[in-house]
């Protein structure tokens, strides 16, 4: 390996989708927003389709248009809805907006004119307080159900606040509120579970699940072993190793000081490549399965490690940042963030290697 390399395994993503589909009684979609969580929708979406996935979700209209070019027959939902004035574009490309307000419903209905409205989703906010019908709008629809006529609605959906915390009271509260609303519109199918929601038990089953993070190898059950296959590995070769004396410092502002004569290895990856600067003096990487700690602050293009305890390590040897010995969730925990952020931040300077199926 001569360059920092991000290895992507579309076969693992497909296998993860199949595993989730096997445990769910309803349909399982694939969430491929943010360029398939940074791994490349052009690579991941066809792999999911080949595995049997027929419904997909993205966040924006532009993402949906790109996905439509890849998958002409797929059912594509747009989570952020239809931008005002773009109803014609979405209708022409058979894209399905997630309607999250009465105003959005009115625009979508109005754009249909005398034609039959293309399919769409209705989004009920049950506690996230971002997008979706609020309590007053939901009550208004219950009182005036004909407002849903002409929208082409297929599903009502909501988004769980804390599905990765099985004991969180919000889970049951959201499920109950969602069920009460959905019961008023029994002709609509339901969509409730995200990745972690699929592991909350039968009470969280629905007609359509929407996993994202778990597809890419993230752990949907943080309090238990990860049931998913890893989909990425991140590694970089050592550029240089330097010997320093006891008392010398490494990196900007000298935040790491050698307590003994030490050897410092430098790799050509930094925060410009998506490694959070919060990993400074916290990251642990792997060399031939052995733990090596970061030394000092991460730079824009470089990261340094203390390899004093490994006299055989040499320039050109490969440092594993994310891989079997240190998965995406462990890496994210050291950074004080979540794996979602890490995945979607990995930059364009890596050599991207696609693992063959």
UniProtKB/Swiss-Prot annotation:
Q: Which cofactor does it need?
A: pyridoxal 5'-phosphate
Reaction equations catalysed: L-alanine = D-alanine
> Its domain of life?
Bacteria
- List cellular component terms (GO): cytosol
Annotated active site: 33 (proton acceptor), 252 (proton acceptor)
Q: Which GO terms describe its molecular function?
A: alanine racemase activity; pyridoxal phosphate binding
Q: Name one Pfam family in it.
A: Ala_racemase_C
Keywords, in A-Z order: Isomerase, Pyridoxal phosphate
This chain belongs to which protein, by name? Answer: Alanine racemase
Q: Which organism is it from?
A: Acidiphilium cryptum (strain JF-5)
């Amino acid at each position: 390996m001569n360059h920092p390399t991000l290895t992507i395994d579309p076969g693992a993503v497909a296998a993860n989708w199949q595993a989730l589909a096997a445990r769910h009684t309803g349909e399982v979609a694939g969430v491929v927003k943010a360029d398939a969580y940074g791994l490349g929708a052009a690579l991941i979406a066809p792999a999911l389709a080949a595995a049997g996935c027929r419904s997909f979700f993205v966040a924006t209209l532009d993402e949906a248009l790109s996905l439509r070019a890849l998958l002409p027959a797929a059912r594509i939902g747009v989570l952020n809805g239809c931008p005002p004035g773009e109803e014609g574009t979405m209708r022409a490309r058979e894209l399905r907006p997630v309607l999250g307000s009465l105003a959005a419903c009115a625009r979508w209905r109005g754009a249909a004119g005398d034609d039959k409205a293309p399919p769409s989703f209705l989004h009920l906010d049950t506690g996230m307080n971002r997008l979706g019908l609020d309590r007053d709008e939901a009550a208004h629809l219950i009182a005036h159900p004909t407002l849903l006529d002409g929208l082409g609605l297929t599903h009502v959906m909501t988004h769980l606040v804390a599905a990765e915390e099985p004991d969180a009271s919000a889970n049951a509260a959201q499920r109950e509120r969602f069920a009460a609303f959905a019961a008023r519109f029994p002709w609509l199918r339901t969509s409730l579970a995200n990745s972690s929601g699929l592991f909350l038990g039968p009470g969280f089953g629905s007609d359509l699940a929407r996993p994202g993070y778990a597809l890419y190898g993230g752990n949907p059950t943080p309090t238990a072993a990860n049931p998913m296959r890893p989909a990425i590995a991140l590694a970089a070769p050592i550029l240089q190793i330097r010997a320093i004396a006891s008392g010398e410092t490494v990196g900007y502002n000298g935040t790491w000081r050698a307590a003994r004569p030490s050897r410092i290895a430098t790799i050509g990856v930094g925060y410009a490549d998506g490694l959070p600067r919060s990993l400074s003096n916290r990251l642990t990487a792997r060399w031939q399965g052995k733990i090596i700690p970061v030394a000092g602050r991460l730079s824009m293009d470089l990261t340094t490690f203390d390899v004093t305890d490994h006299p055989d390590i040499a320039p050109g040897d490969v440092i594993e940042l994310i891989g079997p010995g240190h998965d995406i969730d462990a890496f994210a925990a050291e950074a004080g963030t979540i794996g979602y952020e890490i995945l979607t931040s990995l930059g364009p300077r890596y050599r991207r290697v696609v693992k063959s199926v």
